[in-house]
Amino acid sequence: MSHHSSPPPKHKGEHKGHGLPRGSERGSSSRDKDRSATTVSSSAPMPAGGKSSRTNCPPPAPPKTVNRLINEKSPYLLQHAYNPVDWYPWGQEAFDKAKKENKPIFLSVGYSTCHWCHMMEEESFQNEEIGRLLNENFICVMVDREERPDVDKVYMTFVQATSSGGGWPMNVWLTPGLQPFVGGTYFPPEDGLTRVGFRTVLMRICDQWKLNKNTLLENSQRVTTALLARSEISVGDRQIPASAATMNSRCFQQLDEGYDEEYGGFAEAPKFPTPVILNFLFSYWLSHRLTQDGSRAQQMALHTLKMMANGGIQDHVGQGFHRYSTDRQWHIPHFEKMLYDQAQLSVVYTQAFQISGDEFYADVAKGILQYVTRTLSHRSGGFYSAEDADSPPERGMKPQEGAYYVWTVKEVQQLLPEPVVGASEPLTSGQLLMKHYGLSEVGNINSSQDPNGELHGQNVLMVRYSLELTAARYGLEVEAVRALLNTGLEKLFQARKHRPKAHLDNKMLAAWNGLMVSGFAVTGAALGMEKLVAQATSGAKFLKRHMFDVSSGRLKRTCYAGTGGTVEQSNPPCWGFLEDYAFVVRGLLDLYEASQESSWLEWALRLQDTQDKLFWDPRGGGYFCSEAELGADLPLRLKDDQDGAEPSANSVSAHNLLRLHSFTGHKDWMDKCVCLLTAFSERMRRVPVALPEMVRTLSAQQQTLKQIVICGDPQAKDTKALLQCVHSIYVPNKVLILADGDPSSFLSRQLPFLSSLRRVEDRATVYIFENQACSMPITDPCELRKLLHQ
């Protein structure tokens, strides 16, 4: 199989897909190469249309007016503030106007680093005539999906249920009562041979609204009712969750069926990193180590991670991972970089190192965090959301996807002309790097995936040979080749700094910041790197200082980077959603285990209490995605039921509840965990691969967690040695507790038995509690390591 591939195909809306194998429930968000560029879904018939090219679009007129989005904080909304469209932000003003004027609402949802959102704005929303059509016939509302995931999820559910898939930009037409009746993703501006254009869609919807309004309203109500029934998740008459062993086995088998033996990963291109799947495979391996399936699960996960890290989906020059690969080989990515990918991948590469002992994986994890520190970090400790895929090749030019990341042979030769001393043939540093990373004179990007010729002659770096093979090819020592390549990459990095940069979305989201706190805490603890744990602590302090309302105990969803390093808030604040609480609580629990600072555990307990009050469904079990009051206008109140690019907040919450029960002994949290798993058991039974994170938690709940208690002085060397021993080993189903002997401490008040534990011979001592049994006291790190490996 050739390693030649191509840049992201120029079609379809942007997708943050799940990369799940075929057969996963509601997993059709990933971009499908064979789909047309326009998806239209409707509760009433829509006429077919034709094809269009972006080159047919008339150039946009210079901006004449500023719309009301200029008063927003969201980078995505601000990108549309100079459109001729009379945009409203999501809110009562727009809803009241739609009802008063009896007009349908045109809702457009996207995010600031979305390539196809940029395309639609450039082609349609900047177009004066299209702007006039929108303003005269609709109330136009723009939503940043990252600010309002509840709005996005409700209407994406409609689009996915009534069409072949979903993506962004998502464009939906609503009744004045906010019920959807037509929806789609990216629309080209004009009709072509096979696709309907946006202008035509607008005119036909106008006609339908005038001529068949009652039919549209009836159909919309019927579809909404059907979606409500379909999305119902409830305990029902089930008493206990499904069998973990059965769910585990079925989930593994479904993953095994979709596994790519040669390149790793699951399903067909485009390929997504899917950390939730890799987490599941590692957990499955641990509980099935002595079986063939267990070995297979480990091999699948490690091979996938190695192929991803060697592929072009990793930025070999500046570190960090791009959103997904457009090809089977992980070569040509969609170049956007998302914070949530960096957070989850840093953890899963750290786990790969814990399991394999291969420093390769640790280096990748450290590289990811280096990228986040350098590019996605606010100086006050918070983390930005994303970097765009598009940037101008040169200043003053139109942005192109991937321009910041690709290289020509000529550029590399000019930057790295030095001869390599000791090579078996004449060789420059540039030639060595190009050989190792697969660069060619004509470029290594296939023209079939670059239809506009924007990346002709360009190259995406991808490791083509092992260090050993490259060294043998030129008669060099492996370490010499490693040093030469690292020096070369650093020179490329310094040169790349002078290119026009991609747009940085400096919005900070509580949920993704929580994931990133986990990333720094878990990696720092496992690798014994205190500076990474310190960065996790800074992130948690940022969350508490800027994204937590002390008076109400609630999290805020967003804040924004202001001028001069300041932090700005929206007014009124955007309050947190379920995922904000779930991911922040997980981050705080991981940070407590990494730092042993009990204040983070205390805050996690308070946030969990607030989460339970705001989102728990006392009748059906599980958590709703949004507060009842915040989502009161929406036609659906949903429960997140799929682990995708990010884990489901219900999956994460189930594991949080399990850990909190072990940290505190509070039975009500175990009861909630069991109730949640029972509510989702039918989803897991039907398609376990759609909820691998929840299946993993189900196993942990039925096997029980280990309580690893270390009695000792937190600052003493022997205590630190035992802590580091625990951190260095892959033990996912555990809680780590430091008992310092103070009966008045927070943890001793939660778990009174901690006060009765004693150090042996005044040395730091470990006790392991599992299945209501306690191990013999352990003081030797080697003995502890042996026991944890059993």
UniProtKB/Swiss-Prot annotation:
Residues 1-67 are annotated as: Disordered. InterPro entries: 6-hairpin_glycosidase_sf, 6hp_glycosidase-like_sf, Ssp411, Ssp411-like_TRX, Thioredoxin-like_sf. Keywords: Developmental protein, Differentiation, Phosphoprotein, Secreted, Spermatogenesis. May play a role in fertility regulation. Residues 1-19 have a biased composition (Basic residues). Residues 23-36 have a biased composition (Basic and acidic residues). It is found in: Secreted. The modification Phosphoserine is found at residues 5, 653. CDD domains: SSP411. The gene is Spata20. GO terms for cellular component: extracellular region. One of its GO terms (biological process) is cell differentiation. This is Spermatogenesis-associated protein 20. It comes from the Eukaryota. It comes from Mus musculus.
